[in-house]
Amino acid sequence: MIAEDREYGTFESVTQAYQQIISHTLQLRRYEFETGCMIMFSANSGKCEMLSNGWISMISWTSETDTAGSLTLDICTEGGQCKTYSARGHILCSKNITSISQKNEGKEKVLTICHDNGKLHLTYITVLKSGLDCDIKDQKLEKLFEKEHAERKKQDDDYKKKALKQKDKRRSEQKILEDCDKKDEKKRMDDTEKRKLQEDRRNEKQDLKKRVDDTEKRKLEDDRRNEKQDLEG
């Protein structure tokens, strides 16, 4: 196997401008950098290119099984320098590293991106195969990817469990508040009905007393009128 074309990039003062999760398999990230350096080798010759004040757009897609996908990297500076790197095939993703290997007949491309501590590193190589079809895999790197992938999955599962627990807790607290509100409302209605009943009874007593007083008054008037008639007769 012969490493034909190799490109290495290092970018300083890198900040992530935004991350857009279009779906659980498709993501778009945009980084901004102050300075950068691209070193390019072809066969036995190489050159260095300096970059400044630009942005990097990274579009990554992964399959449902997280084993295949595509990665596209666009780099542009305010001076008009633009570069594009892309590959599709076997993909490995971790917290800070994304690497993809694209195999064609007699050739293999490897694109690796690492973003950590304000720096972004890029490696893009093309390997020519000779003789038997060899599988170039860095066992240590793959184990690191698998370990970080397992840790990320565990963190996601823990977060989902915690979120579900908090949701159940909020639902329980909301039900308690609703039950308290219902009890308070029932108590207010009972108090209102009780006051209305007391008011009705008080009014009935007053009406009864008034009728009794009126009856006694008429009877007294009748007695006086009869006495007067008896005296005159």
Curated annotation (Swiss-Prot):
This is Protein U79. Residues 170-233 have a biased composition (Basic and acidic residues). Residues 155-233 are annotated as: Disordered. May be involved in DNA replication. Belongs to the herpesviridae U79/UL112 family. Its main location: host cell. It is found in: Host nucleus. Disulfide bonds: none annotated. Keywords: Host nucleus. It comes from the Viruses. The gene is U79. It comes from Human herpesvirus 7 (strain JI). One of its GO terms (cellular component) is host cell nucleus. The lineage of its organism: Viruses, Duplodnaviria, Heunggongvirae, Peploviricota, Herviviricetes. It holds the Pfam family U79_P34.
